UniProtKB/Swiss-Prot annotation:
Its EC number is 3.1.-.-. HAMAP family: Nuclease_YqgF (MF_00651). It comes from Listeria innocua serovar 6a (strain ATCC BAA-680 / CLIP 11262). SMART domains: YqgFc. Could be a nuclease involved in processing of the 5'-end of pre-16S rRNA. This is Putative pre-16S rRNA nuclease. Keywords: Cytoplasm, Hydrolase, Nuclease, Ribosome biogenesis. It comes from the Bacteria. It is found in: Cytoplasm.
């Protein structure tokens, strides 16, 4: 069963997909979105769900360090609810605290240029969210 992981931001959605056995996560793409124009990338996510035969979606929930829900986490919750109604599959929220920071550190340690980091950071964060989910549930 393939599972999709999403790192939802205000400008992009990082996408990762699990292998068919649900053991490892691989980055797929970064979808450009524009919240101010109500362009959220739902159609592209649905295309990827169909292409990869996804059966479940995991959306990162960026809780605050004190475990509270801030504005970004509220946006992620709404995104997950709308996505679930549009694709007709279960959508799970997953604590993603510090995944973007960890992804940034990983890319810096790998000596990836600032320009390239900007291109792949959300996809890598989606991989980290999904891999955390897979490691915990398998």
């Amino acid at each position: 069963m393939r599972i999709m992981g999403l790192d939802v931001g205000s400008k992009t959605v990082g996408v990762a997909i699990s292998d068919p056995l649900g053991w490892t996560a691989q980055g797929v793409e970064t979808i450009q979105i524009d919240e101010s124009r109500k362009q959220f990338g739902y159609d592209r996510v649905k295309e990827l769900v169909l292409e990869y035969e996804v059966e479940k979606v995991v959306v990162g929930l960026p809780k605050n360090m004190n475990n509270t829900i801030g504005p970004r986490a509220e946006s992620s919750k709404i995104y997950a609810e709308v996505l679930e109604s549009r694709i007709g599959l279960p959508v799970v929220l997953w604590d993603e605290r510090l995944t973007t920071s960890a992804a940034e550190r990983t890319l810096i340690e790998a000596d990836v240029s600032r320009k390239k980091r900007k291109e792949v950071i959300d996809k890598l964060a989606a991989v980290m969210i999904l891999q955390s989910y897979l490691d915990t549930t398998n």
